[in-house]
Amino acid sequence: MTDSKYVIIGAGISGLYTAWSLIDKGTGPSDIKVVAEFLPGDQSTLYTSPWAGGNFSLITSTDERSMKFDKFTYTNLHRIQELLGGPECGLDMLPSTEMFEQELDHAKLDSISQYLKEYRPMTKEEMPEGVVSGVKFLTWNFNCPLFLANFQKHLAAIGVTFERSKIDHISSVFSPSVDAVFNCTGIGAASLGGVKDENVFPTRGQVVVVRAPHIRENRFRWRPDSDTYVIPRPFSDGSIVMGGFFQEGNWSGNTYGYETEDILKRGLELYPEIGKRNELKIIREAAGLRPSRKGGVRIEVEHFDQVNGKDRYIVHNYGASGYGYQSGLGMANEATDMYFEAAK
């Protein structure tokens, strides 16, 4: 199937981050092939990455490993932005305000305060009724479809091969030249032969994309029973993403009018400067399936076989849920580190 040394299955954000990580550690781009059923520019419920709101937020877990992934990603994204030609690639930094109806974890606050730009806690006077803690900082914002397309374009230009193919079994991508296969299939890990991870499940989200070029700040309100957010999309002719829902186990790719209205109601309460409901220009309503996993992300090296005395490996990197953009560079870094350590 391929003469490449490394095959990455999946062309979502995790797959592209993994390709970059391999190159960053000295792999020649021509030694990498990305094989995927869906490529940047495609639209499918099973191809999650284009549908994401796409920014760095405080949504992730408070365990040490997750915080490490966040920090690595936040502090290294500027390198990818520079490679892709600057903010116009679909990756820019904008202000963010996040408000919580419960106290924030102290370990997480200690971690993010060390590296988030322009970080500061909100004062009591700044917090609306019901909010007990909040922070402001400068965050990364993605125009997800544009960023994916430009990321792929860059990788292809320097020699990475992209191939459209639906893979039924992970072993099918091994040829004599392949040293390792990186499994970045996201929600596809539930059905991929040779993997079929029963711990993988969808977390459905619905968003509303609205034209509001005057909105240049992220805003979040995290409640115990709902999460509301407004995320500007850089270099998108003024689009913002309003959400959202986190529906575990829901495989539906349909959008629902009552959910749209609920999103808009909550979003306008959170961010009234967006405008009046009857004046909003709705560009799109979309649903996506976050690739979640019981037990969290799977980053693991699995011995596959031995050819001519050389061990070959499958490297799993999936289950990022809704954290792929903001944590995925750190996840890819750990996956490639683990592979090179195993292959010594």
Swiss-Prot record:
Residues annotated for anthranilate binding in this entry: 229, 290
Pfam families: DAO
Cofactor entry: FAD
Signal peptide limits: none
BP term (GO), one: D-amino acid catabolic process
One GO molecular-function entry: FAD binding
Binding site for (R)-lactate: 229, 290
PROSITE patterns: DAO
Location of this chain's protein in the cell: Peroxisome
Family: Belongs to the DAMOX/DASOX family.
Name of the protein described by the UniProt record: D-amino-acid oxidase
Species: Komagataella phaffii (strain GS115 / ATCC 20864) (Yeast)
